[in-house]
């Protein structure tokens, strides 16, 4: 049947119907193309494939994060194949666990953010504000329009964010002040894509002596949100994360929080 003739194409079509992002589709297609026999790999073949993925074409070792992503893409394909009755077990079960160092998010200092907003021209100020004060990704900054600001309900609608899922971000007075007078079309002033937004933010940050990226601006929003609320579920929802495991790296305790914890631990009874 068609599934057996080209299972990878059938899987990618199913993923596309589930409205995954183009970036996810591209990455998955690239990884699945390296499988020597997508539906016929036994334990030895699976481990041999995994061994071949440990190094890049230039001979340098692949980062743990990259390997983890490759394993996840392959595992999801095989999981789909099992659901379709094409496999009886998931070959990913034979793969070793990828151990990644758990790093805490690095955020833009508040003083730097103040100067970045103060010195920016209007379009750049809006980009910085949407990242640092609304937690938007570069693709979301590029896509958001003035029509997405819902003042009646006090939210900013993020249409088809990561994974092509809509979500709402609460509006703050500070964010609205930085965005300025509303207009028509894109909030950033012109049509842009994710790469252009990320590059523009990177250039602006470097020009102002700040060794940070667009993602570090977003990390600032999530870190402040978690510090103020302590609610990881709400933080995951507002950030557009599908699970809590990826949000905990933004949980940076304030000195007051740590002091209260130390006082509680220092009491007996």
Regions found by a protein language model. Name each.
Residues 143-179, 245:
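Conserved tyrosine-mediated DNA breakage-rejoining catalytic core shared by Y-recombinases
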Residues 87, 99-106, 110-138, 142:
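Basic, Lys/Arg- and aromatic-enriched nucleic-acid-binding interface segment
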Residues 160-163, 232, 239-264:
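Catalytic-site neighborhood detector that most strongly recognizes the C-terminal catalytic loop/helix
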Residues 140-141, 212-213, 222, 230-241, ...:
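Active-site-proximal segment of tyrosine recombinases
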Residues 172-211, 221:
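Active-site/catalytic core of tyrosine-dependent DNA strand-transfer enzymes
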Residues 9-104, 209:
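N-terminal core-binding DNA-recognition domain of tyrosine recombinases/integrases
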Residues 75, 125-139, 155-156, 223-224, ...:
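Short pre-functional
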Residues 87-89, 100-115, 163-173, 183-187:
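DNA breakage-rejoining catalytic core of tyrosine-based enzymes
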């Amino acid at each position: 049947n068609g599934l057996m003739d080209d299972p990878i194409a059938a899987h990618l079509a199913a993923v596309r119907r589930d409205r995954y992002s183009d970036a996810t589709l591209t990455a998955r297609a690239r990884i699945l193309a390296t499988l020597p026999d997508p539906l016929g790999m036994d334990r030895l073949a699976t481990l041999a494939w995994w061994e071949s993925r440990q190094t890049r074409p230039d001979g340098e070792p692949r980062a743990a994060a990259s390997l983890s992503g490759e394993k996840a893409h392959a595992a999801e394909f095989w999981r789909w194949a099992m659901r379709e009755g094409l496999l009886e077990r998931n070959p990913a079960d034979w793969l070793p666990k990828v151990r990644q160092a758990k790093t805490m998010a690095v955020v833009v200092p508040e003083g730097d953010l103040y100067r970045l907003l103060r010195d920016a021209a209007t379009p750049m100020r809006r980009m910085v504000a949407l990242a640092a004060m609304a937690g938007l990704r570069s693709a979301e900054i590029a896509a958001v329009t003035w029509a997405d600001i819902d003042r009646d309900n006090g939210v900013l609608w993020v249409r088809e964010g990561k994974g092509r899922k809509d979500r709402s971000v609460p509006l703050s007075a500070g964010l609205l002040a930085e965005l300025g007078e509303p207009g028509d079309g894109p909030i950033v002033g012109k049509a842009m894509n994710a790469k252009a937004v990320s590059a523009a933010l990177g250039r602006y940050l470097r020009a102002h002596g700040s060794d940070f990226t667009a993602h570090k601006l977003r990390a600032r929003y999530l870190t402040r949100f978690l510090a103020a609320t302590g609610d990881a579920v709400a933080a995951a929802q507002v950030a557009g994360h599908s699970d809590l495991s990826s949000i905990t790296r933004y949980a940076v305790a304030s000195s007051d929080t740590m002091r209260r914890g130390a006082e509680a631990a220092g009491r007996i009874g």
